Amino acid sequence: MEAIKTDICVIGAGSGGLSVAAGASQMGADVVLIEQGEMGGDCLNYGCVPSKALLAAAESVQAARDAGRFGVHMAEPVIDFGQVHQHVRDVIDGIAPHDSQERFEGLGVNVIRASASFTEPKTVAAGDYEITAKRFVVATGSSAAVPPIPGLAEVPFLTNETIFSVHEKPEHLIIIGGGPIGCEMAQAHRRLGCKVTLLELFTMMPKDDPELVDVVRQRLIAEGIDVREGIGVEAVEGQGTALRVVTSDGAIDGSHVLVAAGRKPNTESLGLAAAGVETERGAIQVDARLRTNKKHIFAIGDVTGGYQFTHQAGYHAGVVVRNILFRVPAKVDDSSIPWVSYTEPELAHVGLSEEQLMQQDAKGTVLRSDFAGNDRARATGQGEGLLKVMVDRKGKIRGASMVGPHAGEVIQPWILAISQGLHIRAMTGYRAPYPTLGEINKAAASSFYTPTLYSSRTQRLVRWLMKLP
């Protein structure tokens, strides 16, 4: 084996690993980056990017179907499923150069395409190389968790890694799991002409506000998706495109089965025992500085078992770079981590939920504003939705939850507000352009002062002032 000594060895070329490698190398560190699969990781190749490209195609179909409400009448759209997936492939190919081996080698990173495994705490074997480093960053991400359902392993089930390789329209897609991936894929495929059944053992999108989730639920049902919650999957059988899912509520026949029942950290082949790194349920345990119990080994992103978002992995990368390069004791702060589910309407959240606020501050306030009261939403026929803003007794913004058009975009001022510890007055003092969806933010914030502004005390004061010359 060829021996390599380096400052930093990054294992995994997903969003987190690439950010560490690019940043550290451009700041002067010697960096080795190891990746056994595709550069760009899950997000580019099997996750965020292809799913949003597919959703965009599905949204265009739905827009054509809904055009009649604006007086624009057209025939039912003809869907070329193969061309839809070519669009998905084109989007991936357009972004791939940014994450490519060639680009990173151009940045001075030594890229090794092989599987990596620790042989001892400060050494990793990867292909024909043995890498010794001062610091290691494990950024191997996660993969679809496959539940132990009898018969599932014997049928050609799909996961997020394989569904974008299906170039012929599934006649009946049965989805196991009602989280964001399951709900997004259910809506996309239904809009593209597939029959879709969505199965969830508990309730769909359980980490989000139940009131807001119900808006999404009702939309999915209205679009023809068979949503079944509280349903256990007992077995899967069949072959090819003749599959049967046996549930606690009876059997369902379909052509394809998508498993979207959570994710698991990718740690099995890393040789963590040889490095002495502690894990729990497969996830690498880290402290607030993202250090493992071996302080020279860091872990970031999905592999730590926490929030599984691309933007979280990127944030982790920044924390690690500050710790490794500048010896700054930077720590993770998840108080303002946002997430978005890209159904239509979108579902977005940041900070404390309504329930969490009430647990922490019984005198806190939940401000509400409906998209039905937003003129831009009305004009575009998208008045379905709601914003909730969580404010503590002192007026500090603690959280925001939203369901509605472009919620992932509209919620962003609240992310900034929470990250900066702002008071609700900060969201009332700016001028929001009219008519925009973002006006809903100012409307919600202004409602904090409504009880005071329109109180009997204020009315008495105004009447007295009006008597003055």
Region annotations inferred by a language model:
Residues 16-20, 42, 157, 182-185, ...:
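Short glycine/serine/threonine-rich phosphate/pyrophosphate-binding segments
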Residues 2-14, 169-176:
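Beta1/beta-strand and adjacent pyrophosphate-binding region of the FAD-binding site
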Residues 2-5, 22-29, 34-169, 197, ...:
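Glycine-rich flavin
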Residues 113, 287-288, 391-393:
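Short, acidic, Ser/Thr-enriched surface-loop or helix-capping motifs
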Residues 9-37, 49, 53-60, 342-353, ...:
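Flexible, glycine-rich terminal cap/loop adjacent to redox cofactors
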Residues 153-169, 251-326, 413-415, 428:
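FAD-site-proximal beta/loop scaffold in flavoenzymes
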Residues 9-11, 116, 131-141, 175-176, ...:
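Short hydrophobic core segments
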